[in-house]
């Protein structure tokens, strides 16, 4: 029997189907763990720019689902701003700034706008950081969920941008707007959309994800904080972990009932990074040298610190979520150091300034940050520093080894005398999607 070449190719394709590409439908990826599981990519050669599309300002990263890219921005109105009471420190000066927030849907292949939805959103937060939305859109079963910087929560149809339901955390729940706006990414759990909201008895609220009907509310705190809630299994029990301005709490995600809590107050309520969990240890970190590991008891009813919190232990990263692997935390932290820490002891195994500086060694500044994504197939880690560089590195408890570095996007936001970009990229379909306050870019990372 003679088999033609074309028939052989067809049969091979049937027997060995292509590995499906992965979407990135929410903050930190499909499983909200900062891990990219897609193979067939090259991480040690400069990526090829496929397209770029103009955007307004914003910290929120893009999300990718079913051939579309979703991102949010703000276009301010410079006329008509009203001065609010000022403080001494520019990091706390607030004004009322007119402007619109916008949710944008792009074609993944071309970057062309498919639809957009904008709404009035005057800002009342600190002017220096009143750039745009903080939260990456979440796409789940045909619905896009977007949370703006002033507490506007919208659910829209993913295909055409039709508003299905909406909430306003200020008018609906009495949220007193925090200095740096609302920044905790919503998450989906079963039929619920769970959000950090604010207001009396409503630090965290669960909505019916299809209708917006409130299903439960829980906790009170002076401020809700900025950290994204997470759902993890501890001692065999799935738990919702929330860090507000007063404490870390473990809740039943179905009902909002609290199992345990630990008092640990982040400076200025800056609980930005999402909690990470290893076995029965819950890791949190924040501004001003604050980091800790909380040990949850076997009955899931009480806690104790695994080690005494100290500025000399932990990482204390500010704008990013740490990456946790095999009991070791990797993150940018205080004083421009990227660190590896043993979560069980708080001991710093090593630290390096290289990932947080530019390729030429310059660029030291305040609140240096980096977003870390582990690439599971290669065992390598991608580090996106706030200079607009993408670094490929090998991270282990033994040290930091840099493999490649590429400049992918211009830093456009000025803070403390330097330009930076604080936006988590998306990694999907062998591509990286990144944005600043001027544009969104798409690069090809596929292996040739």
Write out the residue ranges for each language-model feature.
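N-terminal secretory signal peptides that target proteins for export/translocation
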Residues: 1-4
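Noncatalytic, solvent-exposed loop/strand surfaces
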Residues: 19-448
């Amino acid at each position: 029997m003679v088999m033609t070449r074309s028939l052989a190719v067809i049969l091979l394709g049937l027997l060995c189907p292509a590995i499906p590409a992965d979407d990135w439908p929410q903050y930190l990826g499909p499983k909200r763990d900062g891990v990219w599981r897609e193979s067939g990519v090259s991480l040690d050669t400069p990526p090829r720019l496929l397209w770029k599309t103009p955007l307004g300002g914003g910290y929120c990263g893009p999300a990718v689902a079913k051939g579309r890219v979703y991102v949010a921005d703000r276009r301010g109105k410079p006329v008509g701003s009203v001065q609010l009471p000022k403080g001494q420190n520019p990091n706390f000066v607030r004004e009322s700034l007119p402007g619109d927030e916008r949710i944008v849907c792009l074609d993944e292949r071309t970057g062309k706008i498919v639809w957009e939805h904008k709404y009035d959103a005057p800002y009342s937060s600190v002017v220096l950081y009143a750039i745009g939305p903080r939260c990456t859109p979440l796409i789940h079963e045909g619905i896009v969920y977007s949370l703006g910087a002033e507490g506007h929560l919208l659910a829209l149809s993913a295909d055409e941008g039709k508003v299905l339901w909406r909430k306003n955390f200020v008018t609906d729940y009495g949220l007193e707007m925090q200095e740096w706006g609302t920044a905790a990414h919503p998450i989906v759990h079963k039929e619920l959309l769970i959000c950090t909201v604010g207001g009396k008895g409503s630090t965290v609220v669960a909505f019916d994800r299809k209708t917006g009907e409130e299903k439960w509310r829980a906790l009170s705190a002076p401020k809700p904080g900025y950290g994204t809630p997470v759902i993890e299994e501890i001692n065999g029990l799935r738990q919702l972990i929330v860090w507000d301005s007063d404490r870390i709490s473990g809740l039943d995600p179905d009902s909002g009932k609290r199992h345990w809590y630990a008092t640990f107050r982040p400076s200025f309520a800056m609980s930005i990074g999402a909690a990470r969990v290893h076995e029965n240890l819950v890791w949190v970190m924040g501004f001003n040298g604050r980091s800790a590991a909380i040990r949850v008891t076997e009955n899931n009813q009480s806690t104790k610190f695994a080690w005494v919190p100290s500025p000399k232990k932990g990482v204390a990263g500010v704008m990013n979520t740490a990456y946790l692997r095999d009991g070791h935390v990797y993150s940018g932290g205080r004083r421009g150091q990227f660190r590896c820490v043993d979560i069980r002891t708080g001991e710093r195994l090593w630290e390096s300034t290289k990932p947080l500086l530019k390729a030429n060694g310059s660029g030291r500044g305040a609140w240096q940050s980096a977003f870390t994504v582990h690439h599971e197939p290669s065992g390598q880690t991608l580090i996106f520093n706030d200079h607009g560089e993408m670094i490929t590195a090998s991270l282990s408890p033994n040290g930091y080894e840099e493999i490649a570095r590429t400049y992918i996007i211009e830093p456009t936001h000025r803070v403390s005398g330097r330009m930076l970009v604080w936006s988590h990229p998306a990694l999907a379909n062998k591509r990286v999607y990144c944005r600043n306050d001027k544009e969104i870019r798409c690069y090809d990372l596929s292996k040739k």
